[in-house]
Amino acid sequence: MLERSEPDTALAYSRYDPDIRRTISFRLLEKQRDLKLLWRWMNQAHVVPQWKMAKPIEDIAAYIDINLADPHQDPYIGLIDGTPMSYWEAYWAKDDVLGRYYPAEKKDRGWHMLVGEPSFFGRGIAPAVIRAFTRFLFLDDPGTQKVVGEPSVAARRLLRYAPACAFEEQGEIDLPDKRAKLMFCYRERFIQQFGL
């Protein structure tokens, strides 16, 4: 059963979204607080095909440790009205594997995400949280002119949301773990469509 989280003073981003009439927030992942949650999400049937992390909780704990120690990325928990519902990894593209597949600029950012709670499927929530996290990355560093993505070509639902979130397909690339669509979201276009 989902429980509303305690009031959180350590939110990295929080904004009411009038399209879904709910507040979308992000906070840094905390291992002790979020381990069981992330483990449960990684073992959800809808998450396994993309993330391939259906593993024992000890493996997820090690994965969290690696991510928290990695200077090129930060893990976040996404919340809707205070309830945890998604996991995000924000990364600096130039320092990521993806940076070898296109001419990455120093401040290009990217993200990986999963919606862990099936109760949040539908009702326009996924595009809203994608736009919110993309906005967060643009706000987090004014030098970021582009947010990039590399969803699997098999991630049809996510690819369907891309245009509604100002992401433009650049072509397909073969990454070590998947065939992916290279997607760019330019700051200027995002601001024109959604504002900051």
From Swiss-Prot:
<dbReference type="GO" id="GO:0019290">
    <property type="term" value="P:siderophore biosynthetic process"/>
</dbReference>
<keyword id="KW-0614">Plasmid</keyword>
<dbReference type="Pfam" id="PF13523">
    <property type="entry name" value="Acetyltransf_8"/>
</dbReference>
<protein>
    <recommendedName>
        <fullName>Rhizobactin siderophore biosynthesis protein RhbD</fullName>
    </recommendedName>
</protein>
<dbReference type="InterPro" id="IPR016181">
    <property type="entry name" value="Acyl_CoA_acyltransferase"/>
</dbReference>
<dbReference type="GO" id="GO:0016410">
    <property type="term" value="F:N-acyltransferase activity"/>
</dbReference>
<comment type="similarity">
    <text>Belongs to the IucB family.</text>
</comment>
<dbReference type="GO" id="GO:0019289">
    <property type="term" value="P:rhizobactin 1021 biosynthetic process"/>
</dbReference>
<comment type="pathway">
    <text>Siderophore biosynthesis; rhizobactin biosynthesis.</text>
</comment>
<dbReference type="InterPro" id="IPR019432">
    <property type="entry name" value="Acyltransferase_MbtK/IucB-like"/>
</dbReference>
